[in-house]
């Protein structure tokens, strides 16, 4: 089943009218929290040996949750753990709740949880899953830019350059998950920007097909392409550092 809800909004609406902003959290704090819980999810997914697609799904689910729920009322790390648990089931790489909770605690605190702490957190995840699913209206199947990037590179770039470009573009897609781009643009539009920046980083150029630029295949306008590229690159000049994880 394809995505059925319209989860996309403008950057202005996301930054000014999110539930967290309406509850008094300023933009810098909300951006910081997004960095923090997405970074946590990336590390958690890697520790669980989850595929990158599962990690990306967890991050998008978590970001979508906070378009409808406030950071003031929901602990972002707990929601993130729940989203990783759900994403594993959605993407065919399920892990028992206990495994997800145990590894999460190790990532957050760099030690094993006491038995009672473990059981409380596990119960919180299992009961909190209902709130997350309800908030997301069980709309859980997400298309990511990775396959779009890979298919286009295979068609358009010779093998030795293609591998280099594909990896560069994947890196930009992964990093973009720390921004709100997945709430603003579809996977094909994000894929086009990741390829565009990847081409520049790899010092590669592609000819236009007459008057049609290659990126028009991705249903993206030039203005959208520049906007996505700008936001991707802005990511690398943020004026804060994500701290050590912790609940």
UniProtKB/Swiss-Prot annotation:
The keyword Cell division applies. Keywords: Cell cycle, Cell division, Cyclin. SMART domains: CYCLIN. GO terms for molecular function: cyclin-dependent protein serine/threonine kinase regulator activity. GO terms for biological process: cell division; regulation of transcription by RNA polymerase II. Pfam families: Cyclin_N (PF00134). Belongs to the cyclin family. Cyclin T subfamily. PANTHER family: CYCLIN. This is Putative cyclin-T1-1. The lineage of its organism: Eukaryota, Viridiplantae, Streptophyta, Embryophyta, Tracheophyta. The gene is CYCT1-1.
